[in-house]
Amino acid sequence: MDDLGLSLREDDLNMMTSSRYSATTAQLIEALQEARARTLELVSDLSDEQLMGPRLRIVNPMRWEIGHAAWFQEFWILRHLGGLAPILAQGDGLYDSARVAHDSRWDLPLPSTAQTFAYMNQVLDRVCDTSDRRARDPITGYDESYFFHLALFHEQMHAEAITYTRQTLCYPRPRIGLRQTGDRRLPAESISGDAHVPGGRFILGDSSGLAFVFDNEQQPHEVEVAPFSISKTAVTNRELANFVADGGYERREFWSDEGWEWKRNAAADHPMYWRRESNGRWLRRDFNEWVALEDRVAAIHVNWYEADAYCRWAGRRLPTEAEWEMAASCEPSSDGGSITNNKRRYPWGNNSPTPANANLDWRAMGCIEVDALPEGDSAFGCRQMIGNSWEWTSTAFEAYPGFVPGPYKEYSAPWFGDHKVLRGGCWATRARMIRSAYRNFYTPDRRDVWAGFRTCAL
């Protein structure tokens, strides 16, 4: 990023930390420094009152969240790997998310904002001091690169969460010191219709030898996928508005039993953050501003139940996660009748994301038109499968065969069964973390996250 005084450009850091080749400790430390600078940018304009915010099930108090990110880094790098004593005597009781119930985080005796910033700086300073630290965990056998990546990606996830928390709480959009892409429309030749994928057997999950992947995708395995057709673009605001106009939120036949119960309890009659003016025009809330609904921009803040209901209305369905990954990462044979054995890390190939092929890293500060960024197309012609908006799949979040929890045992296993898989990342996801095989997961009722969807033919 710009204006941080770092010796490497952000694109260089993305390449190094997403490469199949292990980044050096110095490169990982620099990435940790950049990630911490971004975390601080995301909260630097907020008051003490705003940093605590209201008690809501779907967000954390941001003063707790940034302290937790620093504590996590300290726990795994300095304490677990380095064998050092805790910096804060009471830190585990404040910041260990496995021990501290969500609802209690507003009531904790948290350090002040200034003290929290000081703690964050102290942790990072010690992490940057590479002396007197073991290069490998003698118990698990994981090397320091694993724990550096774990802390890095964990903080990046919380940076994305802080961003959608600002949207939830109607705060101004964050002030981030990097070059923005400007016009979110980014006009390009319009595309529509489906891409046909011939199906076949392929390896689901990451098998490219990356230095780090989370435990829920560490067991790549062969699966059989039947031929299918998938939309070349995500569902747009205009398409979702047509569903609303046709009574989609009132017509029981489009909703699953669980979805209808959610809709009634939430009193939902249109997508979240939408508001209709007296003249019938739709507006949507973009952080603390109301803007006209953009027809060709990807629809976001849609939960799984809403996506499923839209599909039923449209005579479509959500893709499975295997279908989504095949459409994003596989290549058709020369005659189009099968897939090859070549699997790409990203839809466009194996090179790391850039602003020319993916809307990531806050550069557009929101979703862009679904026709934009043709350089990011998959081999089958699907656009924006990386970045812009997370995409719901029909698949429940479950363990891959042979699953073994990683050192951070609470990351995946507690959430198997009642969450749904999302793929692709969003505009606030870090380029260095996302790949086609990356699995995200949320409960199907979540509308606050930057999630949309694309559809498949029945």
Predicted regions: what is each one?
Residues 6, 17-18, 337:
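Intrinsically disordered, low-complexity segments enriched in Ser/Pro/Gly/Ala and basic residues
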Residues 14-60, 64-71, 75-89, 93-126, ...:
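Disulfide-stabilized, aromatic/cysteine-rich ligand-recognition loop
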Residues 57, 139-147, 179-189:
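Membrane-interfacial loop-to-helix junctions in multi-pass inner-membrane proteins
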